C-alpha cells in the first residue's frame, strides 16, 4: 500500500539568517527587541515556526549570549501569538583550517565551544525546538 503524501504546509522564518548576515541588508534585526519584533511580525504574517539567532546589538556579529536569547524568548512568548520558537544551537562548532599546505594554526574565524556552552541558552529558555 503506497503512502499518501502529507500536503500540510508549515512556514518557517529564519529571522536573522545564519552567520555574518548583518551587512547583507539594513533590515537584518540586531537587538533582542528587533529580533523578537521580527519574529512576532513573521508569526502574524503566517509563519508557524520562527528560527532565531541573537546578535551583538552594536556590531551585528552572531552571539551565544544566553541573556539575549532570554530576552528574545520572553518577548516572543509574551506576545499574543501562536508560534513555535526555534532557537539555534549550531554555533561553536566551526573549525576553519588554513590552506592545504599549512592547515594549522586554525583560521581566526574558527568558533569552538563546549557542548554545554553551545546549548546553555536552550537549557535556560526551553524553546519548543532547537
Language-model features: locations:
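Structured alpha-helical segments in the cores of large, soluble enzyme domains
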Residues: 36-45, 72, 76
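Hydrophobic faces of well-ordered beta-strands that scaffold small-molecule active sites
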Residues: 11-15, 50-52, 83-89, 128-130
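Acidic (Asp/Glu)-rich catalytic clusters
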Residues: 2-6, 43-44, 77-80, 119-128
Amino acid at each position: 500500500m503506497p503512502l499518501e503524501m502529507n500536503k500540510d504546509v508549515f512556514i518557517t522564518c529564519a529571522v536573522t539568517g545564519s552567520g555574518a548576515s548583518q551587512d547583507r541588508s539594513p533590515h537584518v534585526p540586531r537587538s533582542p527587541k528587533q529580533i523578537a519584533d521580527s519574529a512576532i511580525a513573521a508569526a502574524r504574517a503566517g509563519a508557524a515556526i520562527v528560527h532565531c539567532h541573537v546578535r551583538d546589538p552594536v556590531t551585528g556579529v552572531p552571539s551565544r549570549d544566553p541573556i539575549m536569547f532570554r530576552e528574545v524568548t520572553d518577548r516572543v512568548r509574551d506576545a499574543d501569538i501562536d508560534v513555535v520558537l526555534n532557537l539555534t544551537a549550531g554555533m561553536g562548532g566551526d573549525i576553519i583550517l588554513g590552506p592545504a599546505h599549512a592547515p594549522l594554526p586554525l583560521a581566526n574565524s574558527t568558533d569552538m565551544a563546549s557542548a554545554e556552552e553551545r546549548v546553555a541558552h536552550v537549557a535556560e529558555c526551553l524553546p519548543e525546538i532547537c
